[in-house]
Amino acid sequence: MATLRAMLKNAFILFLFTLTIMAKTVFSQQCGTTGCAANLCCSRYGYCGTTDAYCGTGCRSGPCSSSTTPIPPTPSGGAGGLNADPRDTIENVVTPAFFDGIMSKVGNGCPAKGFYTRQAFIAAAQSFDAYKGTVAKREIAAMLAQFSHESGSFCYKEEIARGKYCSPSTAYPCTPGKDYYGRGPIQITWNYNYGAAGKFLGLPLLTDPDMVARSPQVAFQCAMWFWNLNVRPVLDQGFGATTRKINGGECNGRRPAAVQSRVNYYLEFCRTLGITPGANLSC
């Protein structure tokens, strides 16, 4: 019995020691708006802690160990949402210099080289009521970041591994001889998505899905249709929520490199626009 009591005592001491270590290295406090204690780092994802995950690459404030410039904290009142100020018209946010800077990275061997244009993007955006007034700069940075990732930095306008993507549907039946593989900057797929997008936009996309790959304006319109329907409702939850809506299969540690690719695009565009990214960047 004495041996058993000693073993239990040692196990309890070890448990308390583990809790102490965890308390020193992992913190759930969000620092996007409130900041961290003086001895803690604010991570790229907006949480306080002391390990390399907090103080390394992307560290916003505190005793950062990364050699890169820390990301500024979210200003008071900005919260983590992508619909927060600052705002401006779509033309003033997506300037020729900003858009051309994105497209300058499209390689000469890319199938979509020269396909996506600023004129098409602006025209597509202005066909939606949501973008006819002023828009949140964070939302546009997030939108272009997700479009960049999905299209391979705007290298592609059509999916490489093409399939039929035909699902039985009474409302949007497949047209014989037509395939509904990914097209456009967000790679819209399946007959029911082409049908619903076409109905909303007033375009015959169910019978002519290739229109998305022929017209840059239609390509952006389809992507923005998907964005407004599925992504825009979660803008107040931060950039990570947009990734979950577009491809939730990457989240919860399943495809961290893909998630980070999206985050990197977003941070780059935020820097270009001179805005802070907000909190909750990952999913």
Curated annotation (Swiss-Prot):
User: What's its catalytic activity?
Assistant: Random endo-hydrolysis of N-acetyl-beta-D-glucosaminide (1->4)-beta-linkages in chitin and chitodextrins
Enzyme Commission number(s): 3.2.1.14
Please provide the record's keywords in A-Z order: Carbohydrate metabolism, Chitin degradation, Chitin-binding, Disulfide bond, Glycoprotein, Glycosidase, Hydrolase, Plant defense, Polysaccharide degradation, Signal
From the record, give the cysteines joined by S-S bonds.
31-42, 36-48, 41-55, 59-64
User: Where does the record place the Chitin-binding type-1 domain?
Assistant: 29-66
Extract the GO molecular function terms from the UniProt entry.
chitin binding; endochitinase activity
The record ties this protein, via InterPro entries, to: Chitin-bd_1 (IPR001002), Chitin-binding_1_CS (IPR018371), Endochitinase-like_sf (IPR036861), Glyco_hydro_19 (IPR016283), Glyco_hydro_19_cat (IPR000726), Lysozyme-like_dom_sf (IPR023346)
Q: Name one Pfam family in it.
A: Chitin_bind_1
Residue ranges for the region (Catalytic) are 88-283
Q: Where is the active site?
A: 150
Protein name from the UniProt record: Endochitinase At2g43620
Give the species. Answer: Arabidopsis thaliana (Mouse-ear cress)
